[in-house]
Curated annotation (Swiss-Prot):
Locations listed in the record: Cell membrane
Superkingdom, taxonomy of origin: Bacteria
GO MF annotations, alphabetized: undecaprenyl-diphosphatase activity
Catalytic activity reported: di-trans,octa-cis-undecaprenyl diphosphate + H2O = di-trans,octa-cis-undecaprenyl phosphate + phosphate + H(+)
Note: Bacitracin is thought to be involved in the inhibition of peptidoglycan synthesis by sequestering undecaprenyl diphosphate, thereby reducing the pool of lipid carrier available.
Primary location recorded for the protein, binned into one broad class: membrane
Record protein name field: Undecaprenyl-diphosphatase
Membrane topology: Multi-pass membrane protein
Broad enzyme group: hydrolase
Keyword Repeat belongs to the record: no
């Protein structure tokens, strides 16, 4: 049965990682309804995110290769540091610092108190409303070529909020981008690129801790976690393409309503005792 549960959670991770609905919240909630019931754990969540981030690398590989190449050449002076791709490399590095620092400082809290379903439900609703406001009032005039240091730092701190399940890594970053005046597509694209260093660092660190015996593997074996990760990769790749096409033509209102309704449902389930925090 654990294999089936791992497959289900891999599907959930792949379906929700790139949507502004919080994949960690969904893994936490869905895990409670599975036969073995309970929180899949921060390690399982971080490791399966390696699958979805690999999908990002495959989907945006041309952009990533170009950014890395131009950034590296800018270090030797062979490319002007004002080159858009070289600047993007520096901005991604700069924007990764907030989540790296806060992730280390708050590690114990992230793996315990932050995983309460009461907090998850609250964040789903609150940041759903933030996304609604940002989508409505954002000027949507800026493109990634307009990114500067101030905005890179803003994106970085917004991404750091995703350490709390229910916020959503993409949702928090996209919301910040919209508030800073970026288009829906630009905000989403940068959110996906910015997440790569943070997610790979977190996932590999959690994988190391499990393999080194520093933390228990949790409910699922490494084999089951690996299967979930592969499934998350395949499904996530398909979702990226769909999502980028969707937001090029529509607003984020669908995801706003989904977050609010899901958060409200979790509150009801907690209040009636069907779910435990």
């Amino acid at each position: 049965m654990n294999w089936i549960e791992a497959i289900i959670l891999g599907l959930v991770q792949g379906l929700t990682e790139f949507l502004p609905v919080s994949s960690s919240a969904h893994l936490r909630i869905v895990g409670e309804f599975l036969p073995h019931g309970g929180d899949p754990g921060a390690a399982f969540t971080a490791i399966t995110q390696l699958g979805t981030e690999t999908a990002v690398i495959l989907f945006f590989w041309r952009d990533i290769v170009r950014i890395i190449k131009q950034w590296a050449l800018s270090l030797t002076g062979r490319v002007d540091r004002k080159d858009p791709d070289a600047r993007m490399g520096w901005f991604i590095i700069l924007g990764s610092f907030p989540i790296a620092v806060l992730g280390l400082l708050l590690q114990d809290v992230i793996e315990t108190q932050f995983r309460s379903l009461w907090i998850t439900a609250t964040m789903l609703i609150v940041f759903g409303l933030f996304l609604a406001v940002a989508d409505h009032v954002g000027k949507q005039e800026r493109h990634l070529e307009d990114l500067d240091v101030k905005h890179a730092v803003g994106y970085g701190f917004a991404q750091a909020l995703a350490l709390i399940p229910g916020v959503s890594r993409s949702g928090g970053t996209i919301t910040a981008g919209l508030l800073m005046g970026y288009t829906r597509a630009a905000a989403a694209r940068y959110a996906f690129l910015l997440a790569i260093p943070a997610v790979f660092s977190s996932g590999l660190y959690e994988l190391y801790k499990v393999l080194a015996g520093k933390v228990p593997a949790g409910i699922y074996t490494m084999g089951q976690t690996a299967v979930a990760t592969v499934i998350a990769f395949a499904v996530g790749y398909l979702i990226i393409g769909w999502f980028m096409h969707y937001i090029s033509e529509r607003s984020y209102s669908l995801f706003v309503w989904y977050r609010i309704l899901l958060g409200a449902a979790v509150f009801v389930l907690l209040g009636t005792g069907i779910l435990t925090a």
